[in-house]
């Protein structure tokens, strides 16, 4: 699991989609561990940094965002990268099927095509680029609609894509939406034959 954790604090351990997915896997007889590489309240630049995308690439995005803003005030996630711990940047997920869920807090210039490109930057850090899932949700600031986002991301990722708006009408940061998202990810893992009860 790479990207956003929308349930902040201790409650994440129970109600976030990562926790719910782990429970669903176990309850359904899968002996698989969900590896949590998410950030609470982090932008996509920080997620790329955590995945090991080069500083040069990250600086390119920052420069582009500043240029687009043309002197206007930018959200911190559009230019800021978190200080990450060694534990956060250590890749213990290289043999996993990446489930990429990012963009809620910004960092992609309100441009779904750039978000897709950033998702690909993260996917490219994995040895197996053929097995993955991307989940999309409209950003917290509603600067891009679900329809616009889904159109670009579903075209880019095809059968690998899950639109959270198609799965639940609940706001993405609610427990209900997190539950629905975990169920959709499990269904997609099964549908694409990524997991087995071995």
PLM regions: where:
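Substrate-gating cap/lid alpha-helix
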Residues: 119-179
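Conserved SGNH/GDSL esterase-like catalytic core that processes O-acyl groups on lipids
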Residues: 6-113
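Sec-exported extracytoplasmic/periplasmic mature domains
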Residues: 22, 26-30, 103-104, 124-131, ...
């Amino acid at each position: 699991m790479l990207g956003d954790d929308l349930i902040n604090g201790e409650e994440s351990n129970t109600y976030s989609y990562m926790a719910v997915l782990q429970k669903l896997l176990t309850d359904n007889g899968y002996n698989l561990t969900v590896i949590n590489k998410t950030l609470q309240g982090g932008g996509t630049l920080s997620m790329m940094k955590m995945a090991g995308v080069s500083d040069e690439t990250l600086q390119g995005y920052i420069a582009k965002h500043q240029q687009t803003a043309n002197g206007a005030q930018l959200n911190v996630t559009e230019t800021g990268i978190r200080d990450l711990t060694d534990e956060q940047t250590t890749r213990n997920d290289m043999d996993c099927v990446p489930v990429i869920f990012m963009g809620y807090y910004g960092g992609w210039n309100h441009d779904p095509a750039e978000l897709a490109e950033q998702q690909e930057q993260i996917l490219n850090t994995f040895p197996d680029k053929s097995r993955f899932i991307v989940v999309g949700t409209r950003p917290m600031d509603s600067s891009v609609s679900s329809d616009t986002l889904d159109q670009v991301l579903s075209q880019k990722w095809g059968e690998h894509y899950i639109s959270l708006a198609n799965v639940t009408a609940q706001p993405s940061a609610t427990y209900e939406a997190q539950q629905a998202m975990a169920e959709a990810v499990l269904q997609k893992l099964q549908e694409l034959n990524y997991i087995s009860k071995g």
